[in-house]
Amino acid sequence: MSFLFFSKPSLSEVQHLVNLETGISILDVFQMSYAEWHGGQISPFSIGRFHYKPVWEASYIQRDESEIVFDPGVVFGSGWHVTTITCLEALERIFQQENISSAIDLGTGSGLLALATAKYGCQRVLAVDLNPLAVSTTWFNIRENGLESRIMPCQAKAEDNVGIPAELLMANIHYDVLQRIVALEEFYLKKWFILSGILRSQFFELRELFRTRPVHIEEVWNEGQVWYTILGKIVS
């Protein structure tokens, strides 16, 4: 399944393109609002020491250091999904304990985790996504927050970037990709990790795997026994 996004009504143009091809026709039309696409209205929220605001509600005249502004565009990352919220809470836990100087955000979406990590003081953050729309959206949000010197967006497969040296690895991503990530020895060279996008049965699979590896699970979030987020540390 594929989606095309338009900034204005475009049915006539689409119909014209369809008419140029044989064997193709429009079967149905469903109009979805921007809020429906994201699963609800996008509004400000606060987690830990930061306030997250969509760009259309942020002040360009007076921003304080606790503000992170973002535009999710049409990619995942409105901030309201429970996996995003719990990942941000996990980040707060890490930075309450120590400073992190390098991090990788795999499946960055709109870049919220990367933005927060850099705002906490992390000097080098690699924000990776296979979706080019996510990369361009993240780059926009990086510039909006003046974090160009700290975050580098990259279009690539998540598992191809696990080997890049970093103290922290974050991955809020499909479970099939997570499985490939944790199967790599390079994963266990990190100091901290945050994994999310995990369902109940998948969490138990990961927990059993980590019992055989040098991993200490610091905290687990399991909102409604549906979505799980794991904050873990590699034991050297």
Label every model-predicted segment.
Residues 1-61:
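N-terminal auxiliary segments of SAM/dcSAM-dependent transferases
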Residues 2, 66, 226-230:
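Short beta-strand micro-motifs in enzyme catalytic cores
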Residues 24-27, 125, 215-218:
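Hydrophobic anchor at the start of a short beta-strand
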Residues 24-25, 48, 64, 123, ...:
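A short helix-to-beta-strand connector/capping loop
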Residues 37-97:
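SAM-dependent Rossmann-like transferase core, predominantly class I methyltransferases
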Residues 130-234:
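S-adenosylmethionine
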